């Protein structure tokens, strides 16, 4: 199977450091697969759904906010009290981050 090179961040957001780590793992360490993994009941996604503002977390959550706005099927209870809404936002967020990684990385 091989080794796992892991770069973790709340809300599985992308940034220059995370993308740089992915590029290192592929180009230098020889990784052949990158997985962006969201999870149920993600606190960062819930924070974005609730429009939380708290210190440096605010900037991180702002990267998840587009997924909140992109989710159009849940018209009521668009907050963390609605587990269906949170799950849909989490899925959209993963897809958005995969797209951003592909767009931003030349490797």
Regions picked out by a protein language model, each given a short descriptive name:
Residues 2, 11-32, 43-107:
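Divalent-metal-activated hydrolytic enzyme cores
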Residues 4-6:
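Conserved beta-strand scaffold positions in the cores of enzyme catalytic domains, especially
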Residues 8, 35-39:
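Short beta-strand segments
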